[in-house]
Each structure stands twice: as structure tokens, then as C-alpha cells.
């Protein structure tokens, strides 16, 4: 189940393991359209990948710190380090490949 992050919880939620960070906004149609896919992929990953959701309207400091300027933005992280970043309208295939990268344990 995706976890909603706040400025207080973001570092802890992303510090260990493979994490798919979803920066989204309530008025971002591409963000909303991709949410069911991301939820399904997390379920398929069986705990190998955690999804952390960041509502950009409520967490501007986190967005600023990570230089997230457009939505949607997806950041692939492992043990607190950024591996890769996808921004703008990305395809379902790109998101599936991101999950495969995180599940496989290899570099992006």
C-alpha cells in the first residue's frame, strides 16, 4: 500500500531498501491517471519495492529540496540515494521498467 510522506517522514521512508517516490498533485491529471498502475505494480512487487507518495501541494519543502519542479515526477531510490528520475507524462511501460529496475537490485 502506498505511504503518504510528509517533510518529517520523507527521509525515514526512503532511507532503506528500494523506493519508488511519486510526486503528484490533486489537479495533475497524468498523476491521477497513473496511480492505479503504480498501486498494482507495488502489489506485484510483493514488498520488494515501497511506494512513497508526496503531495506537492502539501510538501513544498520536500519538492524544493529534491528539485522537483514539474508533475508528475517519479524518483527511484535505493537506501536513500537517487538512482533515476522520470518527469512529465511517462508511459506505463516506463513505470513498469522503473519497478523492474528497483526489484532487480541493479543500477538504473
What are these regions (language model features)?
Residues 60, 66-75:
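Structural micro-motif
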Residues 30-45:
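Typically the conserved alpha-helix immediately C-terminal to a functionally engaged Cys/Sec
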Residues 54-62:
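Structural microenvironment flanking redox-active thiols in thiol-disulfide oxidoreductases
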Residues 5, 49-51:
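Hydrophobic/aromatic anchor residues within beta-strands of the central parallel beta-sheet
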Residues 14-26:
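Short active-site neighborhood of thiol/selenol oxidoreductases, capturing the structured segment around
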Residues 75-108:
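Non-catalytic, surface beta->alpha helical segment in thiol-disulfide oxidoreductase systems
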Residues 1-17, 101-108:
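N-terminal leader/targeting and pre-domain segments
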Amino acid at each position: 500500500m502506498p505511504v503518504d510522506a510528509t517533510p518529517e517522514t520523507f527521509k525515514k521512508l526512503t532511507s532503506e531498501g528500494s523506493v519508488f517516490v511519486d510526486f503528484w498533485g490533486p489537479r495533475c491529471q497524468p498523476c491521477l491517471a497513473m496511480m492505479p498502475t503504480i498501486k498494482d505494480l507495488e502489489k506485484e512487487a510483493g514488498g520488494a519495492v515501497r511506494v512513497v507518495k508526496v503531495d506537492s501541494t502539501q510538501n513544498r519543502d520536500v519538492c524544493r529540496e529534491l528539485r522537483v519542479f514539474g508533475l508528475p515526477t517519479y524518483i527511484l531510490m535505493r537506501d536513500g540515494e537517487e538512482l533515476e528520475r522520470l518527469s512529465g507524462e511517462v508511459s506505463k511501460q516506463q513505470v513498469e521498467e522503473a519497478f523492474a529496475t528497483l526489484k532487480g537490485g541493479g543500477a538504473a
